Amino acid sequence: MNLHLIWATLIGAVLGSLADWLFAGVLFHGRYQVHPEVWREGAGGQRHRIILAQALALVTAGAFVLLAWKLHQTDYKGALKLAAMIWLIGPLPVLLANALFIKIDHLVTASHAAGWLVKLLLIAAATAWMLG
């Protein structure tokens, strides 16, 4: 297996995790309590949930890297376009549909949507850097 695929995945996962931290953890942090009944109570299981979320970031990065490699979209232009298309197909519609039916502050939804776009673009940049 090409070692560059692994490096692209690891770098993409780290960058994606930083995007998650900023857009889902820092921006509009106080707005999460506009509808506190939506969120799980207590901080007891947060560490476990954070570890699982980081594992998902690794899966996201790995899947993106492999898809870009398989589709021969490993240059910057191709990888960034692929990231934007994935965002339009997956995270954006899901987040907007959730906002229609779940009481989530609109700024939180916007932050999560922007975070997903940035995460995918960063993974794309890591992919192009390592494989392009």
Which positions does each model-derived feature cover?
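Juxtamembrane/disordered regions of integral membrane proteins
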Residues: 1-132
